[in-house]
């Protein structure tokens, strides 16, 4: 449900200038993977139950490469790694989730034009291939892992760019065969995020669409009713949903190529007014992450860019301060947050396509 009402926000937005990065620093040993790997994204979680965050890296994009599992040494460095599975894939995402409710994190693999995969954790951080799901001809770009039918088990919403999007329901044993299509065939969806926007007790889906298509919100539990979000002239590459202004209602953040990025503020009825923009009109933002970088109780924004320095935006409760970090020459496809050093502050992992993936450690104290 979209309203033309322009919501009055309690804070002002950022200026067009960027400040020097003072919060995050890289380390020569805090890199992951090969410099020539075409990494699309990464996920973080404690896969071996040793108390620190490990990292799964999705490699390949359109080209066949091997995905990797990196194990944290307890100090934020990743000196041990394993290949995921025995074959190379054209992978875009590798989210972690406990799909069988056995207490450990499993891996779901989103592949381009080959079937998607499920790897189950043996409880010790080793991953065993379990099954395929999806169609070989699908252009899968993103996965949203969330319980969509309120049965207590996570399901999978699949973003298939310019082919049919699907929901795959969990059979309560971590197997995904029962599927439901939603939206029109040919919707150019890149990413999906989820929240209960209309507060009816069911999770809804918000889609980031490319190719001149408007973004959409599909409402659960049947995902037939939808509303548009944003303009039809934007190339949206990422979407997230969080309560950015601490009013108790989740908002929607979208990032775009060749246009400013946007925050759509939600209200108690699930309406979204005209957006507040951040960044510059020539930004080429490929991905975003949301988290409290400075532990001040409100949410900040991190943007990963293609051929530009990456950015983070610090929310001080009244405005956002913008900072740049990383190399302008990098093709950054993904951004992942996690406290990799267990010091109580979030660090930033940037997934680069054609150069090494880099961890930027939070210098806050």
Which residues are covered by each model-predicted region?
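Blade-edge motifs of beta-propeller repeat domains
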Residues: 19-37, 71-89, 120-138, 169-187, ...
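Beta-strand-rich domains and repeat architectures in extracellular enzymes and scaffolds
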Residues: 33-60
């Amino acid at each position: 449900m979209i309203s033309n009402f322009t919501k009055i926000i309690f804070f002002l937005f950022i200026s067009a200038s960027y400040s020097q990065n003072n919060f995050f620093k890289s380390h020569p040993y805090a890199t992951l993977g090969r410099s020539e790997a075409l990494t699309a994204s990464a996920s973080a979680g404690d896969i071996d139950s040793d108390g620190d965050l490990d990292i799964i890296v999705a490699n390949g994009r359109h080209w066949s490469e091997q995905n990797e599992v990196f194990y944290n040494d307890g100090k934020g460095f990743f000196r041990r790694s394993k290949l995921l599975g025995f074959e190379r894939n054209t992978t875009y995402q590798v989210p972690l989730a406990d799909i069988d409710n056995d207490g450990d994190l499993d891996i779901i693999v989103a592949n381009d034009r080959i079937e998607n995969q499920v790897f189950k954790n043996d409880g010790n951080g080793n991953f065993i291939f379990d099954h395929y799901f999806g169609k070989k001809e699908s252009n899968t770009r993103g996965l949203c892992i969330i319980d969509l039918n309120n049965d207590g088990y996570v399901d999978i919403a699949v973003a298939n760019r310019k082919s049919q999007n699907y929901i795959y329901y969990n059979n309560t044993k971590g197997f995904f065969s029962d599927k439901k299509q939603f939206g029109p065939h040919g919707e150019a969806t890149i990413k999906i995020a989820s929240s209960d926007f209309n507060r009816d007790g069911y999770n809804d889906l918000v889609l980031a669409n490319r190719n001149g298509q408007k973004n959409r919100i599909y409402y659960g539990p049947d995902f037939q009713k939808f509303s548009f979000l944003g303009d039809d002239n934007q190339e949206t590459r990422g979407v997230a949903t969080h309560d950015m202004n601490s009013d108790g209602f989740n908002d929607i953040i979208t990032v775009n190529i060749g246009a400013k990025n946007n925050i759509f503020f939600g209200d108690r009825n699930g309406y979204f007014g005209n957006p507040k923009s951040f960044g510059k009109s020539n930004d080429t933002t490929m991905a975003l992450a949301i988290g409290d970088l400075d532990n001040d109780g409100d949410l900040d924004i991190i943007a990963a860019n293609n051929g530009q320095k990456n950015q983070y935006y610090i929310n001080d409760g009244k405005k956002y301060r913008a900072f740049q970090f990383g190399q302008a020459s990098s093709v950054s496809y993904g951004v992942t947050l996690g406290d990799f050093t267990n010091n109580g502050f979030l660090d930033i992992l940037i997934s680069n396509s054609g150069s090494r993936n880099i961890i930027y450690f939070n210098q806050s104290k």
